């Protein structure tokens, strides 16, 4: 018996990396998965792989900055399966770090649109469906950058992830009465393409890893297992919380 048997899950940013692993894991745990991204070719391949493994999944085009795309994605979940139980706001971007006075307003707006506005829009459109289903679980992927560790963080990225952290707590407080839980996950350095693109300077990356007590990057599987826990009924008394997965970096 899977941890998500009978559940319907919607995942953003699911075409590759952590999002794809979430889609695959959730399907393996018995969920009926709807997942979206803007990388349609890669998303279709993930969809095919899940189905080949015996899981149930459908890919949809989802630009998280477009409200109409969210309406369609939630509509796909409820139209196909009659309900929505889980939302994973996974989609996010990072841009190369520059001093604040060199960052353009357009770059800032783009990061905030994907990372923060996308979480708001997904949550906004998931809540009515979850309310009709009698409750649900929303998991927002933030970052340790949203809590601290500011020295080497890109300013727009850190601000967007901090916004997610507080938005999560407000959502949890406002919708506990609807049976909707909302929690955030805060990974530190994780071995993904996005992390490596954020730290092209290998010397800087090495120095950052030296400050992690466990002495290594995290893995996608380690983050996905935490997301699965928060999505499942095993975490039924947890809401408004932040789960840090950083090898002990913030504990120093």
Q: What kind of region is each of these model predictions?
A:
Residues 3-34:
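Canonical Rossmann dinucleotide-binding motif of NAD(H)/NADP(H)-dependent dehydrogenases/reductases
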